[in-house]
Regions:
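Conserved alpha/beta-domain cores
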Residues: 2-135
Length: 135
């Protein structure tokens, strides 16, 4: 499958109707969002909904998961619960340093090893969204 996407469809991870209906638009990639579109009170339920979506109704396209940023209290729970589902990639928002990306890579690798997933199967897509990230 091509790694260039014409369409990347972002879906709030806490909205079952949108999760179910996302594939109807036939995007090249669906990104389940656990970050900005999900309130702090719904982070756990969003992880559960995305988990069930990928276990029981995985879309026929590339799948990414936008996790919470590296300094967030939700970050490690996002990574540890999503990597075993083997998305094509995790999207790291607000990446500001190489350390942010290295930290995520180490965590993903540990989880891949623990779950007998091929090392490097889950990729990282880092988003630069701040001035510090540009520098």
């Amino acid at each position: 499958m091509n790694s260039l996407y014409r369409t990347m469809f972002f879906v709030p991870g806490n909205d079952p109707k949108k999760i179910i209906g996302a594939e109807i638009y036939r995007p090249d990639c669906i990104i389940y969002d656990l970050e900005d579109s999900v309130s702090i009170f719904e982070k756990d339920s969003a992880r559960i909904l995305v988990k069930y979506a990928l276990q029981y109704n995985r879309p026929d396209c590339r799948v990414g998961i936008r996790i919470n940023q590296a300094d967030s209290p939700y970050y490690e729970d996002d990574v540890s619960s999503m990597v075993p589902l083997q998305p094509d990639f995790l999207r790291l928002p607000k990446a500001e340093t190489a350390e942010d990306i290295k930290k995520l890579d180490v965590l993903i690798t540990e989880i891949e090893e623990k779950h007998a997933i091929e090392i490097g199967a889950v990729k990282i897509v880092a988003s630069i969204e701040t001035a510090l990230g540009v520098v």
